[in-house]
């Protein structure tokens, strides 16, 4: 996965956001997605870290869904939302902007 230069994050981000990284990893394991999907999801999350804790669950879920798309792991928004304990709408509203911000062209469906 090649993220755009704007999406590079400092090394300390992984430590500061370890709770959310673990949640992404746990959900990825539950969904049986590839290591590539999990890595893409964590990279997206750490590059987009919101300052508000309220935004983090939905962002983490959207990052996992986007990571699945990037790596070709077909998972539904509903399955990802359930694994991350957020609403499907939270995932639906956030995944396309995430991909665009990272320099990807999201699918048009």
Predicted regions and their residues:
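Non-catalytic, interaction-prone regions of core transcription and DNA-replication machinery
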Residues: 1-109
């Amino acid at each position: 996965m090649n993220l755009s230069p704007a999406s590079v994050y400092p090394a300390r981000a992984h430590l500061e956001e370890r709770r959310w990284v673990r949640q992404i990893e746990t959900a990825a394991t539950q969904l049986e997605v590839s290591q590539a999907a999990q890595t893409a999801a964590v990279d997206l999350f750490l590059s987009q870290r919101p300052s508000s804790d309220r935004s983090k669950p939905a962002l983490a879920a959207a990052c996992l869904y986007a990571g699945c798309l990037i790596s070709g792991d077909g998972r539904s928004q509903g399955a990802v939302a359930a694994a991350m304990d957020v609403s499907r709408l939270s995932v639906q509203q956030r995944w396309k902007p995430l991909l665009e911000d990272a320099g990807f062209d999201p699918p048009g469906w």
